[in-house]
Amino acid sequence: MAGYSVKLTKLIKEYHLEQIWVPENLDEIVIETAELNRPGLQFAGFYKYFDPERIQIIGKSEFGYLSGLSREKRLEMVDLYFSKQPKVVITTWNLTITKELGALGEKYSVPILRTSEGTSEFMAALTVSLSVALAKR
């Protein structure tokens, strides 16, 4: 039996997510897992258990880590991350998206969205919503 899915556009509307960069096929992107990921370990180079199907949530900790890297190293790590083509990247706390980050979203066709909500609150609400929508019936 096929699993359930939620259109990314539904989540954008439900959570009033700002679209920083989105591909032309935005209406075709579906989320099929309630699992979320904060990519701090990926920015440090660890990909062993990385699942690009998960919604990626970038908050203050991830931005803080990246800002501590040299520009060259930061670009290298973020390019590697986007090359894995995560389903969608959502930043929290209304964090400023650099032109570099936006360009990598476009380069790898990865939607980049933003919310003004705090990371924990947003993740909790999103997890509940996805768990209900994707639950076995």
Describe the function of each predicted region.
Residues 46-57, 61-136:
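Feature captures the catalytic cores and cofactor-binding loops of soluble hydro-lyases/lyases
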